[in-house]
Curated annotation (Swiss-Prot):
Biased segments, Basic residues type: 127-151, 451-465
Low complexity: bias regions: 166-177
UniProt feature, compositional bias: Acidic residues: 156-165
Residue pairs linked by disulfide bridges in the UniProt entry: none
Name of the protein in its database record: Cruciform DNA-recognizing protein 1
Gene Ontology BP annotations: signal transduction
Single GO term (MF): DNA binding
């Protein structure tokens, strides 16, 4: 174990200077430990002092407002070259020791830091609980024996109760174990114990502007040096709430200059032109005269309205030109109807041709009796004459039909360019195509094949196809 001795010692300096710093061998004379200014105005600090042995000394010095000084309240020691320092011995440190377990904090201005005093509490009841448990065990044993002999059990119970009264301990005889009865430990020499080392924080020596206010119990009320110059201390306002609200409401209720002044200006401009009450009667008379004057004109017009309109003459009907707007409408509507008819006719003719070919190629055999058909009669001269008309008439009809076909084809090309059939319309056209009728053997035998037309009308139909 180390033979170093450690003591807590309080260094002080009287009131007067602004800043006091303690320095010595503990910080190699660097001046790193400032003293704390107390409420009285003096400077103090408590710190641990280490001594290597009993004969060793603790040398220190004070720096007061930047000047190295020596205090007269401590022992002085002259060093070589005329330097003087304060010092402490072991005897000085032992005299200042206080109760063990309490120490002072240097950073808190020498405040004590120790164990709190013991607080008194209720007496312990552990002894009572132990006695109750022992008595219960004894009684349970005695009850078991009473089953064998009731008389003996009763006597034994009385004896045991008497023994309990003599040997049992009460709470009064039990030694107190509360904190109140435990004595405090006697103070021992702190020199024998070696408490832990204290960590001393460095401080800047150039901080001369710092001021410490010695106020007991923390900061208090602030006293301003010039209270007369502050407005808050002198101005007092007595404001009536109703008057203030009325004044503010009047300021807020401002008319909106949007539509009001425009209407008023127009009215004011026309207002001088308005007549008074006497002039109004005159105006009503004038209005009545004006109405009477206008009535014959209305009567003159009424017979014209009641007269029947003249019917248009045939000359007028001829002279009326046809409207040019009707022609494009007819041209646009007709091709649509023609297209639908041609689509159905073409499909139906194709289906009929296919059916006729199938009927000719296939030989249908049925169980029905064979019927002899009547032979075709030769055509007469009158019928041939009707079929052979004049070639001039037929040529004129063919030219007209060709012209009509050309006009229809031109209209179709125009409409097809304007409107192309959509996918839905194409589907509808395909759906509208008639289904091929499958001829059953029974029905085909009964139906007769259609005769081919070789006359003039048949040739015309072929041309249209």
């Amino acid at each position: 174990m180390s033979s170093e001795l450690m003591f807590n010692y309080t260094f002080s300096w009287p009131a007067g200077p602004k800043d006091v710093i303690l320095t010595g061998t503990f910080d190699d004379w660097r001046g790193t430990l400032p003293l704390v200014k107390t409420a009285k105005g003096n400077f103090e600090i408590t710190m641990p002092v280490k001594l290597a042995n009993k004969d060793d000394t603790f040398q220190f010095k004070f720096i007061v407002d930047g000047v190295w000084c020596v205090s007269d309240s401590y022992k002085k020691e002259h060093v070589s070259e005329g330097i003087e320092n304060n010092f402490l011995q072991i005897t000085d440190l032992v005299e200042t020791q206080e109760v063990a377990g309490a120490s002072r904090i240097p950073e808190a201005g020498g405040l004590l830091c120790g164990k709190p005093p013991r607080s008194a509490g209720p007496p312990s009841t552990s002894n009572r609980k132990k006695n109750k448990r022992n008595n219960k065990k004894r009684r349970s044993k005695l009850k078991k024996k009473s089953t064998k002999n009731n008389k003996k059990s009763n006597e034994s119970l009385d004896d045991n109760e008497e023994e309990d009264g003599v040997t049992g301990t009460t709470t009064e005889d039990v030694t107190g174990t509360s904190r109140e009865e435990t004595p405090l430990a006697e103070p021992t020499n702190v020199s024998k114990e070696a408490p832990g080392n204290f960590h001393i924080l460095p401080i800047d020596q150039s901080a001369d502007t710092t001021q410490s206010n010695g106020i007991i119990g923390g900061p208090g009320p602030v006293l301003v040096p010039n209270p007369g110059e502050i407005k808050e201390f002198t101005e007092i306002r007595d404001v009536d709430a109703r008057e203030l609200n009325e004044r503010l409401n009047k300021k807020e209720e401002v008319p909106e200059p949007v539509a009001g002044p425009i209407v008023e200006s127009s009215v004011t401009e026309k207002s001088p032109a308005l007549p008074q009450a006497d002039d109004l009667i005159v105006e009503t008379k004038e209005m009545a005269h004006n109405v009477q004057e206008l009535t014959p004109q209305v009567e003159a017009v009424t017979p014209l309205i009641n007269e029947p309109e003249p019917l248009p003459t045939p000359e007028a009907q001829i002279s009326i030109p046809e409207s040019s707007k009707v022609e494009p409408v007819e041209g646009s509507l007709q091709p649509k109807l023609v297209e639908k008819r041609e689509s159905t006719e073409g499909v139906s003719d194709g289906s009929k041709k296919v059916e006729n070919k199938a009927k000719k190629d296939e030989e249908v055999f049925t169980l029905d009796p064979i019927v002899n058909k009547a032979p075709k009669l030769p055509l007469t001269d009158e019928q041939t004459a009707e079929g052979r008309k004049s070639p001039a008439v037929s040529e004129e009809k063919e030219k007209k039909k060709k012209q009509e076909k050309g006009s229809k084809e031109v209209k179709r090309s125009e409409t097809s360019k304007e409107k192309k059939p959509s996918a839905k319309e194409v589907k509808k056209q395909t759906v509208k195509a008639p289904k091929k009728q499958t001829a059953s053997p029974l029905s085909s035998s009964t139906e007769e094949p259609k005769k081919k037309k070789t006359g003039f009308f048949g040739k015309l139909k072929k041309l249209f196809k």
